[in-house]
Every structure is written in C-alpha cells, then in structure tokens.
Amino acid sequence: MPATLLRAVAGSHRVLSKAHQCRRIGHLMLKPLKEFENTTCSTLAIRQNLDLFLPDKTAGGLNKSQILEMNQKKSDTSMLSPLNAAHYQDEKAHLPTMKSFGTHRRVTHKPDLLDSKWFIKILKRHFSSVSTETLVPKQDFPQMKRPLKASRTRQPSGTNLPVVSVNEDLMHCTAFATADEYHLGNLSQDLASHGYVEVTSLPRDAANILVMGVENSAKEGDPGTIFFFREGAAVFWNVKDKTMKHVMKVLEKHEIQPYEIALVHWENEELNYIKIEGQSKLHRGEIKLNSELDLDDAILEKFAFSNALCLSVKLAIWEASLDKFIESIQSIPEALKAGKKVKLSHEEVMQKIGELFALRHRINLSSDFLITPDFYWDRENLEGLYDKTCQFLSIGRRVKVMNEKLQHCMEPTDLMRNHLNEKRALRLEWMIVILITIEVMFELGRVFF
C-alpha cells in the first residue's frame, strides 16, 4: 500500500511538471508571435529558434499520412514550416526534446494553442501592409520651366488692349525711341533723297518735329505718315514693315547717342487705329480718327497721339536705364549688411551720383512729362486727345514711381560719399599727427643733443 501511494505521488508530480512545461512552451511561442506582427526581422528569429528544437525525431511520433500532410503544408508556406509542423500533431504526437529551454522532457502539445489560420491571416495582413508601402514608387514630377520674365518697367499698351474683332480696315501705329536726339535738318534731306515727301503744313509753334509722307502705305484707307521728334523718337502710321526697316536704317546716320537695338525693339508702343465717322477719340485702347477731316487737321490729331506715344517710349528707355543703374549699386547695401568693405573709389561714387542727377534732369526738367506742352494750350480738342493717351499709357504714374526710385538710389550713394569723405578726413588728421610728432622729436633732439 505505501508503495502504491508513492507511485501515485510520483505520477502526479510528473503530470504537474508536464502541465507547467506546456504553459512555459505556450508562453514562449506566443511571445515571438506578437513581436512578428511588428517587424519582419522577428519572423526570421522565430524560424531560427524553432529549427533548434524541431529535430528529425519529431517524425517518429507521427503517422505517415500526417507527415505527408505536414510536408505539403511546409512546401506551401516555407517560412511557417516549424509552426505548421507543431500544429498538425494530434494527441498521440509530442513536441520534440527542447534542449534550448534547459529540459529533456517531452510534453504533449495542445492542439488549439496556435491556430494556423489565425496566424496565416496575421502574416498576410502584415505582408500586405508592407507591400503597399514598398511597391508604390516615388513619382518624380518633371520640373516646369518658368517663362521668361519681362522687363520690370515695361508696360506695353498691347497687353492692356481688349480682344478686338478682326477688321480689314484696322491699321497700325508704332512708336520707337532710338537715340537721345536727332539731327532733323540732315535727316529731312536724306529722306527726301530716298523718295519720301516732307509735310510742311504744320503750325509754327509745332517745332522740333519732322513729318514725312510715304507713297506706298500699308493699307489704302489712310496715307502713310512718319513723325520724327527731336528727342529721339519716331512714330509710324500705316507704314509697311519693309519701309519701316528702311527708314530705321537711314535714321541711324543722324542719331546722337543711339540706344541698343534690342532695347529699341523691345521698348516700343503699338496701337491700332481706324477711320470712323464722328469725333476722333481713344476708346478701349484703339484710336478712332475722324474720316471727314482734311489732311492738315488729320495730321494735327495724329501729332497729338504721336506726342504721347513718344513720351511713353522715351520713358520706357529711361526706366530700363534706371533698372540697370539699380543693379550696379545693389552690391553696396549687401556688402554693408554683411560687414564687408565696399570697393568703390571716390571717383566711382561721384560718377554714380552724376548718372542719377542726369537721369533726374532728363525726366523732370528737359521733357514734357510733368506739364502739358504749350502747343495744346489754345487747342482744347488736341489737348484732350493728348491727355487721354497719356492717361492710357500711365505716363504720370510711371514718372512718379521713377522719381521715387531715384530718391531711394540717392541714399546709398550719399552714404558712400559721406563714408569716403570721413575716411579722407581721418587720413589727413593722421598725417597731421605724424608731422607734429616728427617735429616734436626734432625739437627734443635739439634740446637734449
């Protein structure tokens, strides 16, 4: 009887140890599974650990059909082969001896401890999320090239024009500024030698202007006319492109301080005009000339429009010159901001100041930008056409903006001039101090020696 009790106690001890071992195995197998959901590297670690405690002796506790079924599952899911082999064991099958866990006992595996369908579902969900992140390529959008930036001061009237209907009677008026001044006397003779006819029916107070007629106009509705202003501008009315190029070539011989060709062709003004019945006017960017006027009155109205166009193109040239000057002094505030020395001599600073004063003198003193010319004082109808065209071309606003820019440009140049004057005064003071020191040394030498 005591022997029977001892065997029963020993058997219960083995049962408890086996149950405890099953709990340890389940806990150790579930922990890597949770880590497997987070990272793919943990999946490889599980496979390596399971390969250690799954020797070939495991097949001894399985029948033949179960081994074949297990091998088929292993071929389907190669990465999950150790776990699938453990899942397909029945009640007679046992887990292999696991030396890695520090024991030689074999414990019975609980069939529903790990559900392969649940585990495969987790893996599919994990790999599907990974694949969506890795398979989507990064799209490289092509860089769009920016369009070329136009001049900051350029405001051609053509950009403000509304869309007009196609009209066969529509003619063109184009203005260019090619130089600072023209020799009108020599130009008149040169153009007359090329077959152009001078119009001499202008009033006596319309000085500093030359009007030439063209035989072959661009369209038959209006005779071709060219206005040359002494200020260095030319306005073409209903003139062919071929004739315009020829006149511009002849004009090069009589220019004083000509401008760059590219700048001349860029800073131009072009308006469309048409002959109508009624009073002449500028309506929505289109010149409408009275068709009932005689030749002399039509020339005067064209002169009013041409005068405003001349001011616009001259102002555009000076705006471009001011922009170029601003770029030349742009390094001064940048150098002062960075604490660097400004490498400008006193002569260069005075030259910059002279350029500013010359440009301001041209705009405010030697041109008609600020006041209406005397020619329009007793001609109210022509003054209205002139003012309307100047307003359309924004001449008053552009002159105001340009004067403000000139005022701002004077500040860094004045600063540099004062700085150079202070350096010169400091240099003179040091020279005086050195001379006084030398004189004192001579006096001391005379006293003591």
Swiss-Prot record:
| Compartment(s) where it occurs, according to its Swiss-Prot or TrEMBL record | Mitochondrion
Q: Which domain of life is it from?
A: Eukaryota
Read off the transit peptide span from the entry.
1-16
Report the GO terms under cellular component. mitochondrion
Family affiliation: Belongs to the RMD1/sif2 family.
The Gene Ontology biological process annotation of the record reads:
positive regulation of mitochondrial translation; translation
Chain's gene name? RMND1
Give the matching InterPro entries: DUF155 (IPR003734), RMD1/Sad1-interacting (IPR051624)
Q: What is this protein called?
A: Required for meiotic nuclear division protein 1 homolog
- Keywords of this protein's UniProt record, alphabetized? Mitochondrion, Protein biosynthesis, Transit peptide
